[in-house]
C-alpha cells in the first residue's frame, strides 16, 4: 500500500518532495489506479461566487509558482512524530480533551481504540501546539487582536501540521464505526471523506473533499499551498470574508493545478452517508436502515452543538445509542 511504500522510499527526505508529483503519479500508474474513474470533474468557475475569484486573484503568483514545481517544504519541528513508521493522526481541541464536551470525549476515545498502535495520535492544545508548528508573526498578531478566530486558527494549524508531518487530520467530532478505515487510509496517496454527487456552483466543495478529514504525505503540494495561501490572505485582510475560506483555497488549488487535481481525484467516493446521523441521531433506530448505512459508511460526523439522547420519548433506542453500543 502507499503508506508502506512512502515510509520505505520517501519519509522526511526533503529532496524527494521536489519530485513528489511525478513519484506519486508513477505509483498510481504502477498500481493501475485510474484518475478518470474517480470524481475529478471541475466546476464551471465562471458561475462560482465572488469569493472564488478573490482567492484566485490573491493566489495568482502562488499558483504560477506551484505550476513550475516550486513547492513549499517545512521541516518537522518534533522529529518523534510518526516514529517507527506509524501514521500521524492529528486531533485538535484547544482547551484539551478533558475540557471537551462529552460527545467529543466519546469520539476521541473511539478513535484511540480503533487506531490502537497503528497510528501516532497527537492531540493539539493551546499548551502544546508550539511543539509542532510555528505561526507567523502576522497570524499570531491578528489572532491576538481578535481578527482570527479559534476556528480559523485551527485551519492554519491543520495546514501546517499536514505540510510538516503528513498524516491524517480528523475533526474531533467524527465517530469511526469499524476498522475498514485502516485499509482505506493506506491505499491511496491522498485520502479524504468524499461524498461525490452532482457538481453545484453554489457548493464549492460539491462532495469532492472534506477539509476536516484529510490524509496525505508530508510536503504534499496541496498542504503547502494551503499554508502559503493563508499567509497571503491574512497578510492582506483583517477578517474572514467567507466562513468557507479554507474550501475556497482548496478549490483554487484543485481547479488551477491539474496534477494536484488528478491525485486528489484518485481518492474514490467514500462514506456517502457521513452526515446522516447528525440529523438522525435522536430518531428511533431502524436496524435494517443502520445496516444499509454502515455497509457504505464507516465515518460519521456528529456535532457537540446538538443534544443527543440514548432513547426516544417513547423509550426506543436511538441511532446515537446504536453508535455508542459499538464501543
Predicted regions span which residues?
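Active-site acidic Asp-centered loop
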Residues: 165, 170-172
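Small-residue hinge/turn detector
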Residues: 155-165
Amino acid at each position: 500500500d502507499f503508506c508502506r511504500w512512502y515510509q520505505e522510499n520517501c519519509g522526511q527526505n526533503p529532496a524527494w518532495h521536489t519530485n513528489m508529483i511525478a513519484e506519486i503519479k508513477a505509483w498510481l500508474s504502477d498500481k493501475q489506479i485510474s484518475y478518470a474513474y474517480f470524481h475529478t470533474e471541475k466546476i464551471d468557475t465562471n458561475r462560482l461566487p465572488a469569493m472564488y475569484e478573490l482567492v484566485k486573484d490573491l493566489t495568482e503568483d502562488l499558483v504560477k509558482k506551484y505550476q513550475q514545481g516550486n513547492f513549499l517544504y517545512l521541516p518537522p519541528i518534533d522529529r518523534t512524530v510518526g516514529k517507527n513508521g506509524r501514521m500521524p493522526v492529528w486531533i485538535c481541541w484547544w482547551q484539551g480533551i478533558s475540557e471537551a464536551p462529552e460527545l467529543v470525549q466519546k469520539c476521541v476515545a473511539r478513535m484511540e481504540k480503533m487506531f490502537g498502535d497503528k497510528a501516532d495520535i497527537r492531540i493539539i492544545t493551546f499548551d502544546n501546539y508550539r511543539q509542532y508548528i510555528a505561526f507567523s508573526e502576522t497570524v499570531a498578531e491578528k489572532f491576538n487582536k481578535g481578527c482570527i478566530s479559534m476556528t480559523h486558527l485551527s485551519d492554519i494549524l491543520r495546514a501546517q501540521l499536514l505540510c510538516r508531518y503528513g498524516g491524517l487530520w480528523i475533526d474531533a467530532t467524527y465517530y469511526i464505526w469499524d476498522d475498514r478505515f485502516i485499509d482505506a487510509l493506506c491505499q491511496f496517496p491522498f485520502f479524504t471523506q468524499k461524498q461525490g454527487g452532482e457538481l453545484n456552483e453554489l457548493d464549492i466543495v460539491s462532495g469532492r473533499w472534506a477539509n476536516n478529514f484529510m490524509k496525505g504525505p508530508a510536503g504534499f503540494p496541496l498542504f503547502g499551498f494551503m499554508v502559503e495561501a493563508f499567509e497571503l490572505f491574512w497578510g492582506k485582510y483583517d477578517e474572514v470574508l467567507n466562513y468557507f475560506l479554507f474550501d475556497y483555497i482548496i478549490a483554487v488549488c484543485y481547479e488551477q493545478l491539474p496534477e494536484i487535481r488528478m491525485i486528489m481525484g484518485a481518492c474514490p467516493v467514500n462514506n456517502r452517508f457521513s452526515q446522516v446521523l447528525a440529523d438522525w441521531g435522536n430518531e428511533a433506530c431502524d436496524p435494517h436502515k443502520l445496516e444499509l448505512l454502515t455497509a457504505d459508511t464507516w465515518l460519521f460526523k456528529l456535532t457537540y452543538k446538538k443534544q443527543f439522547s440514548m432513547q426516544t420519548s417513547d423509550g426506543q433506542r436511538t441511532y446515537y445509542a446504536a453508535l455508542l453500543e459499538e464501543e
